[in-house]
């Protein structure tokens, strides 16, 4: 198709105007989006952003940040999820638009607690660090200006005048490197971290910061900006949650699981009850291993433990009949009357299989669900051992599982950094004698099936898993399923007016 010169000019101007909305592949997210989007797109963008941030967290503890391997794997994740990452790529507008909108959606979900805010800020900072590291040098100054960072690169004459002082404060810079390196004049108060580390030259209240070090200042500014914005959003959240279209999604997005939900398995019935003791030591994650041990020792679990463990067993293949037999046998060993069990407990088991009440088929809990909701109290055994156990108790538990001392140290370091799922992944690698398990652990049932795949050479249960439905994200908890149902009940063509949310950011 050919266009006249006038039409080509109009098309070019329209493209220029769109690109002007997002001049760079990275930003400080200073202005919220104001367009209308469908509820379906709202939900999809939110889940894609969660996937990206989870990938950033996993890569950050698996690889040294900034290394070639880290950079290439992160770029691949960003490209796969269709977010922006490089300048001067074709079709820049849509990835940058997705990046912009999804960031603000997650602000609504992750402003609700200090733990959520801390996690969100850290992953967003790592994303910004990556994008800045591949930003062309000739784009840095305009990015700083657009981000309201008033740092000006000094002239070559000024740089030559202070060459010796700058190099003395930055040992990694030689004269040749400095010649091609931009140096920024930054107010002293913005460079305190560099000053404390004696990594910057100061003069008359200003720090002279080479480009390689300016990222530390940019990240500090971004952290402060985002932290304030999340606090503001948190104060306004009750008003946002009054919107019946948003409330179900936002309430559960922060601990949602976007992978396979393990609710329907082709291997149902292929696990026998006499296998469970053996499987618990070989293929159960620590959270389920401790629940099984507590059940065998005490012949009872409280409601939180029964729900977490019961749905896990359902997910690995126990039928309703097997589940009723398993729990009844164990509770009777604890001197419970069989009639009491039938009246007080069997209903709840049938309910979890979708045979009572609303006939809803409950799904096994994901790691995020276990970590972030219903913390265990005195006498409880549910929860995540890496999140809910103190360091000494966790150390003793790992020792009882025959984890070597070096592995325990690595696990405790990961827990100290709040990387609970990665700590569990390290436990998996230690107990299965693999250097790299090759997956990101997000679900206890995933742990089980990956374990079986390794132990059986991929010939047993793992092959029986039904494939996840790729077009849709399937939250793993009942509440998130309710959230998705609430959204699905609305016409997907209904539009979400993002401009109406502007005052909450």
Curated annotation (Swiss-Prot):
Originating species: Mus musculus (Mouse)
Recorded domain comment: The RNA:DNA duplex-binding domain interacts with the template phosphates at positions -2, -1, 1, and 2 positioning its bases -1, 1, and 2 for duplex formation. Interacts only with the beta- and gamma-phosphates of triphosphate moiety of initiating NTP of the primer. The side chain of His-303 mimics a RNA base that would be paired with the template nucleotide at position -1 via a hydrogen bond, thereby facilitating the stacking of the initiating NTP. The interdomain linker provides flexibility in movement relative to primosome platform composed of PRIM1, the N-terminus of PRIM2, the C-terminus of POLA1 and POLA2. Together with POLA1 interdomain linker, allows for large-scale conformational changes of primosome and coordinated autoregulation of catalytic centers of PRIM1 and POLA1. It is proposed to move the C-terminus of PRIM2 close to PRIM1 during initiation, then move it away with the 5'-end of the nascent primer during elongation.
UniProt-annotated stretches for the region RNA:DNA duplex binding: 300-442
Quaternary context: Heterodimer of a catalytic subunit PRIM1 and a regulatory subunit PRIM2, also known as the DNA primase complex. Interacts via (C-terminus) with PRIM1. Component of the alpha DNA polymerase complex (also known as the alpha DNA polymerase-primase complex) consisting of four subunits: the catalytic subunit POLA1, the regulatory subunit POLA2, and the primase complex subunits PRIM1 and PRIM2 respectively. Within the complex, POLA1 directly interacts with PRIM2.
Chain spans, region Disordered: 463-486
Protein name (Swiss-Prot/TrEMBL): DNA primase large subunit
Cofactor: [4Fe-4S] cluster
CDD domains documented for this protein: PriL_PriS_Eukaryotic
UniProt GO cellular component terms: alpha DNA polymerase:primase complex
Chain intervals for the UniProt region annotation (Interacts with PRIM1): 266-503
Entry's Gene Ontology molecular function annotations: 4 iron, 4 sulfur cluster binding; DNA binding; DNA-directed RNA polymerase activity; DNA/RNA hybrid binding; metal ion binding
Ranges where the record places region Interdomain linker: 253-270
Keywords: 4Fe-4S, DNA replication, DNA-binding, Iron, Iron-sulfur, Metal-binding, Phosphoprotein, Primosome
Binding site for [4Fe-4S] cluster: 287, 367, 384, 424
Keyword Coiled coil: no
Phosphothreonine: residues bearing it: 470
GO BP, one annotated term: DNA replication initiation
Similarity annotation: Belongs to the eukaryotic-type primase large subunit family.
Source domain of life: Eukaryota
Function: Regulatory subunit of the DNA primase complex and component of the DNA polymerase alpha complex (also known as the alpha DNA polymerase-primase complex) which play an essential role in the initiation of DNA synthesis. During the S phase of the cell cycle, the DNA polymerase alpha complex (composed of a catalytic subunit POLA1, an accessory subunit POLA2 and two primase subunits, the catalytic subunit PRIM1 and the regulatory subunit PRIM2) is recruited to DNA at the replicative forks via direct interactions with MCM10 and WDHD1.
Cofactor: how and how many bound: Binds 1 [4Fe-4S] cluster.
UniProt-listed InterPro entries: DNA_primase_lsu_euk, DNA_primase_lsu_euk/arc
Residue spans of biased composition, Polar residues class: 467-478
């Amino acid at each position: 198709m050919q266009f006249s010169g006038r039409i080509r000019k109009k098309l070019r101007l329209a493209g220029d105007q769109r690109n002007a909305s997002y001049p760079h592949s990275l930003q400080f997210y200073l202005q919220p989006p104001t367009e209308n989007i469908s509820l379906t797109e709202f939900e999809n963008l939110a889940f894609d952003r969660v996937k990206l941030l989870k990938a950033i967290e996993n890569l950050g503890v698996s690889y040294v940040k900034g290394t070639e391997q880290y950079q290439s794997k992160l770029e691949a994740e960003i490209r796969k999820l269709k977010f922006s990452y490089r300048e001067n790529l074709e079709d820049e507008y849509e990835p940058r638009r997705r990046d912009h909108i999804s960031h603000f959606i997650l602000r609504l979900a992750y402003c609700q607690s200090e733990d959520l805010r801390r996690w969100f800020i850290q992953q967003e900072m790592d994303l910004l660090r990556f994008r800045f590291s591949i930003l062309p040098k000739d784009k840095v100054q305009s990015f700083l200006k657009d981000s309201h960072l008033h740092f000006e690169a000094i002239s070559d004459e000024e740089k030559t005048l202070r060459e010796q002082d700058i190099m003395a404060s930055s040992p990694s810079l030689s004269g040749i490197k400095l010649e091609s390196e931009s140096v920024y004049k930054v107010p002293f108060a913005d460079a305190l971290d560099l000053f404390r580390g004696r990594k910057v030259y100061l003069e008359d209240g200003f720090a002279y910061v080479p480009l390689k070090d300016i990222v530390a200042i940019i990240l500090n500014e971004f952290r402060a900006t985002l932290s304030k914005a999340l606090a503001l959003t948190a104060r306004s959240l009750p008003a946002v949650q009054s919107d019946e279209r948003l409330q179900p999604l936002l309430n559960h997005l922060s601990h949602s699981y976007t992978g396979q939900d393990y609710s329907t398995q082709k291997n149902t019935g292929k696990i026998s009850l006499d296998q469970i003791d053996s499987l618990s030591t070989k293929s159960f994650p620590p959270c389920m291993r401790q629940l099984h041990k507590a059940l065998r020792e005490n012949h009872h679990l409280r409601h939180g433990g029964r729900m977490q463990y019961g749905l896990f067993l359902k997910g690995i293949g126990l039928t309703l009949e097997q589940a009723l037999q398993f729990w009844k046998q164990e509770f009777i060993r604890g001197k419970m009357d069989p009639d009491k069990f039938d009246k007080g407990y069997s209903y709840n088991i049938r309910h979890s299989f979708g045979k009572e009440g609303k006939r809803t088929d409950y799904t096994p809990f994901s790691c995020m669900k276990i970590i972030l909701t219903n913390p265990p109290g005195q006498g409880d055994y549910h929860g995540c051992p890496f999140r809910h156990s103190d360091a000494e108790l966790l150390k003793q538990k790992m020792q009882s599982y025959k984890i070597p001392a070096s592995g325990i140290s690595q696990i405790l370091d990961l827990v100290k950094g709040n990387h609970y799922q990665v700590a569990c992944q390290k436990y998996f690698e230690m107990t299965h004698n693999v250097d790299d398990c090759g997956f990101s652990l997000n679900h206890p049932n995933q742990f089980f099936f990956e374990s079986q795949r390794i132990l059986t050479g991929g010939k047993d249960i793992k092959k029986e898993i039904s494939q996840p439905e790729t077009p849709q994200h399937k939250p793993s908890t009942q509440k998130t399923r309710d959230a998705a149902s609430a959204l699905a009940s609305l016409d997907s063509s209904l539009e979400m007016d993002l401009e109406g949310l502007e005052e909450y950011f």
